[in-house]
Swiss-Prot record:
InterPro entries: CAF1_poly(A)_ribonucleases, Nucleotide-bd_a/b_plait_sf, PARN_R3H, PolyA-riboNase_RNA-binding, R3H_dom, R3H_dom_sf, RBD_domain_sf, RNase_CAF1. This is Poly(A)-specific ribonuclease PARN. GO terms for cellular component: cytoplasm; nucleolus; nucleus. CDD domains: R3H_PARN, RRM_PARN. It comes from Bos taurus (Bovine). Residues 178-245 form the R3H domain. Belongs to the CAF1 family. Its main location: nucleus.
C-alpha cells in the first residue's frame, strides 16, 4: 500500500492495526545517497573495527535522507499454515510545519539518484507529497510552543478564560500602544452593545500587540467573549472576538485544543509509525540493515551519539529485537549452501532445495507482490522479500529438530542467536556488530599497515609484496592500505624491508592501532585540559549557561561513485577467501576488552536513558530468553 502525505492520516489506523496483530515486521529504506566523500570501497574497508565502521557511517552517511521507508508485517495463520502480509511503502520528507519549525538540510549523491530514477522511482512523491516527521527533541519543542501559546491566551490550556499566570489587575500598557488598545476596547464595547453582530475581526497586528490584547481582555472581560488568533491567506495573524455564553466558550476552547493536538500529530507525522513499531517490542527484520537502523534512529528519534557503545544502548532501547537476514545467510548452517547473499539472489536461492518457500498471501485490500517481476529498490517490496527470506531460513532450522518442524515462529529459541547482531559489510574477520555486548576482536597478527605515494596503484603493492606469496589488499585511502599476508611469521620480515625505504613505510597492525589509540588519548586529554581552563572563566561571566553541542557533519563535496546500492554489495572473491582462511581464535579476555578511552557518561548515554524512561510502559510481544539456543549459534569466530 502506497502511503503519501495526502492519505497518511486516513490510513494510519490500518498501519497501527497491522503492527498490533503482526508476529514480526520486515523493514527497508531508500536513501538520497550512501557516502558524501569516500568511495563505497573506502567506506567499507575490510579491516575496519566496529567502532571505525560506525564512525565512518555516522560522518559520511547521516547527512543523506531516508525518504522511502518500506514496512511489511507478517502474521501466521495456523489454520491454513500460511502467512498473511500487509505491505506499506511510505514516502517521507521533512516539510517544515510552521515558521519556527526546523528547516532540514540534506545532501544527495548523483549516482544514487540516477540509480533510483533508472528503477522508476517517483521523486515527486517524495518532494511534493512526502509525509513530514519530527524527532523527539523537535516534537518536545513544538509541544512547548503550543503550551506557551495556550498559556498566553487561554490559561495554559484550561477551560477558564483567565490564565493562572495572568494578572487579574489592570495591565501596564506602554505609552505608544495605549491608543491602539483603547481602540480595541472601544470596538469590543460596540460589539457587546450590538444585537446584530456576533463576531469582531481585528486588523492584523504584531505578536506583542496580540499579547497586550489578550492580557487586557482577560482582565477587563473575564466572561462573555471568546478570543482566538487566526491567519489570513497571506500568513498575517489577526484576532477574532466572539460574543458567547460560558457553555459556548468552553465548547470552542475544546475544539481549539483538539485542533492543536491534531496539528501536532500531523507534524510528528511518520515518526508515529516508527514509535508504534518500537513500542510493540516485536522482532524487526532487515537485510544488511545497519544503515537502515542508523538512519531510522538518527532521523526519527535523535542525532546519533559519538560513541559506539552509546549507539548500541540507544538502538536496543528503540528496537529491542533486530535480526539481519544477510548475517543469518552468511552463518552456519546456511553459509555452505548459499553462495550469494545479496537480497535478490538470496530470495531466488531460498526457493530451491533444501529450502521450502513459505506459503504467503496478501491481506484483503492490500496489493500483492509478484517476486518474478522483481520490484527491487522499492522499499516496500524489499521489505516483503526480506521477510520471505527470514521465514525460509527459520523454517529450515526447524528441519534439524527431532521431530522436525515445518514452521518456526519469530518467538522460537532457534533464532535467538541471531538477535541484535548486524552484518558488517566487507569486514573480513568480524562478521557482525553486536548490539548487546562487546564486539569480536580477532587476531590480526598477519596484517600490515602500509603508507605510500599517492601515485601508487594496486599493482605496485602486489609487486612490493611479491616475495610473500598470496596477499590481500584493503585500501584505506589514496596513500594507505592494509595488506594481509598468508603467514604471520612473514610479518617481521616485511616490516624490516621498509626500514630504509624512502617512498613507503610498513608497520604491524598492532603498532598502527596503538598509535591511533595514543592519538585519541592525547586529543581527549587536550580537550579535558582545555575545559579546565574554560570552566573558571565561564563561572566568572554573566553570559548565561554553556553547553557542549553535538558536532554536525556537513558534506564538503558530492563525489559521484559507481552506481551501487546497499543491497548488492557482496564481499569480493578475495575477501571471501580470506574470510574462510581466518583462524579467528579469540580468547575470553580479548572478547571482554573494551575501549579504555570510553567516557563513563555522555550526552548519548543520557539520550538512551531518556528513551528508556519514555518506553517504561513497553509491553513487548514475546520475550527474549537470557539463555541462547544451542543449535546454530552465530559463531564467535568467522
Amino acid at each position: 500500500m502506497e502511503i503519501i502525505r495526502s492519505n497518511f492520516k486516513s490510513n494510519l489506523h490500518k498501519v497501527y492495526q497491522a503492527i498490533e496483530e503482526a508476529d514480526f515486521f520486515a523493514i527497508d529504506g531508500e536513501f538520497s545517497g550512501i557516502s558524501d566523500g569516500p568511495s563505497v570501497t573506502a567506506l567499507t574497508n575490510g579491516f575496519d573495527t566496529p567502532e571505525e565502521r560506525y564512525q565512518k557511517l555516522k560522518k559520511h552517511s547521516m547527512d543523506f535522507l531516508l525518504f522511502q521507508f518500506g514496512l511489511c508485517t507478517f502474521k501466521y495463520d495456523y489454520t491454513d499454515s500460511k502467512y498473511i502480509t500487509k505491505s506499506f511503502n511510505f514516502y517521507v520528507f521533512p516539510k517544515p510545519f510552521n515558521r519556527s519549525s526546523p528547516d532540514v538540510k540534506f545532501v544527495c549523491q548523483s549516482s544514487s539518484i540516477d540509480f533510483l530514477a533508472s528503477q522508476g522511482f517517483d521523486f515527486n512523491k517524495v518532494f511534493r507529497n512526502g509525509i513530514p516527521y519530527l524527532n523527539q527533541e523537535e516534537e518536545r519543542q513544538l509541544r512547548e510552543q503550543y503550551d506557551e501559546k495556550r498559556s498566553q491566551s487561554n490559561g495554559a490550556g484550561a477551560l477558564s478564560y483567565t490564565s493562572p499566570n495572568t494578572s487579574k489587575c489592570p495591565v501596564t500598557i506602554p505609552d505608544d500602544q495605549k491608543k491602539f488598545i483603547d481602540q480595541v476596547v472601544e470596538k469590543i464595547e460596540d460589539l457587546l452593545q450590538s444585537e446584530e453582530n456576533k463576531n469582531l475581526d481585528l486588523e492584523p497586528c504584531t505578536g506583542f500587540q496580540r499579547k497586550l490584547i489578550y492580557q487586557t481582555l482577560s482582565w477587563k472581560y473575564p466572561k462573555g467573549i471568546h478570543v482566538e488568533t487566526l491567519e489570513t491567506e497571506k500568513k498575517e495573524r489577526y484576532i477574532v472576538i466572539s460574543k458567547v455564553d460560558e457553555e459556548e466558550r468552553k465548547r470552542r476552547e475544546q475544539q481549539k485544543h483538539a485542533k492543536e493536538q491534531e496539528e501536532l500529530n500531523d507534524a510528528v507525522g511518520f515518526s508515529r509509525v516508527i514509535h508504534a513499531i518500537a513500542n510493540s517490542g516485536k522482532l524487526v527484520i532487515g537485510h544488511n540493515m545497519l544503515l537502515d537502523v542508523m538512519h531510522t534512529v538518527h532521523q526519527f528519534y535523535c542525532p546519533l551519539p559519538a560513541d559506539l557503545n552509546e549507539f548500541k544502548e540507544m538502538t536496543t532501547c528503540v528496537f529491542p529485537r533486530l535480526l539481519d537476514t544477510k548475517l543469518m545467510a552468511s552463518t552456519q548452517p546456511f553459509k555452505d549452501i548459499i553462495n550469494n547473499t545479496s537480497l535478490a539472489e538470496l530470495e531466488k536461492r531460498l526457493k530451491e532445495t533444501p529450502f521450502n518457500p513459505p506459503k504467503v498471501e496478501s491481506a484483503e485490500g492490500f496489493p500483492s507482490y509478484d517476486t518474478a517481476s522483481e520490484q527491487l529498490h522499492e522499499a516496500g517490496y524489499d521489505a516483503y522479500i526480506t521477510g520471505l527470506c527470514f521465514i525460509s531460513m527459520a523454517n529450515y532450522l526447524g528441519s534439524f529438530l527431532s521431530p522436525p518442524k515445518s514452521h518456526v515462529s519469530a518467538r522460537s529459541k532457534l533464532i535467538e542467536p541471531f538477535f541484535n547482531k548486524l552484518f558488517l559489510m566487507r569486514v573480513m574477520d568480524i562478521p557482525y556488530l553486536n548490539l548487546e555486548g562487546p564486539d569480536l576482536q580477532p587476531k590480526r597478527d598477519h596484517v600490515l599497515h602500509v603508507t605510500f605515494p599517492k601515485e601508487w596503484k594496486t599493482s605496485d603493492l602486489y609487486q612490493l609484496f611479491s616475495a610473500f606469496g598470496n596477499i590481500q589488499i584493503s585500501w584505506i585511502d589514496d596513500t594507505s592500505a592494509f595488506v594481509s599476508l598468508s603467514q604471520p611469521e612473514q610479518v617481521p620480515i616485511a616490516v624490516n624491508t621498509s626500514k630504509y625505504a624512502e617512498s613507503y613505510r610498513i608497520q604491524t597492525y598492532a603498532d598502527y592501532v596503538g598509535k591511533k589509540r595514543e592519538e585519541k588519548q592525547m586529543k581527549r586529554k587536550w580537550t579535558e585540559d582545555s575545559w579546565k581552563e574554560v570552566e573558571p572563566k565561564r563561572l566568572n561571566t554573566q553570559c548565561g549557561s554553556y553547553s557542549l553541542q553535538n558536532h554536525h557533519y556537513h558534506a564538503n563535496s558530492l563525489t559521484a561513485t559507481s552506481t551501487v546500492g546497499k543491497r548488492n554489495l557482496s564481499p569480493s572473491r578475495a575477501e571471501a577467501g580470506l574470510e574462510a582462511r581466518a583462524s579467528g581464535e579469540i580468547s575470553d579476555t580479548e572478547l571482554e576488552q573494551t575501549d579504555p578511552c570510553a567516557e563513563p557518561l555522555s550526552e548519548g548515554r543520557k539520550k538512551a536513558k531518556k528513551l528508556k524512561r519514555m518506553k517504561k510502559d513497553l509491553s513487548p510481544t514475546g520475550s527474549i530468553s537470557d539463555s541462547s539456543a544451542k543449535l546454530f549459534e552465530v559463531p564467535d569466530t568467522w
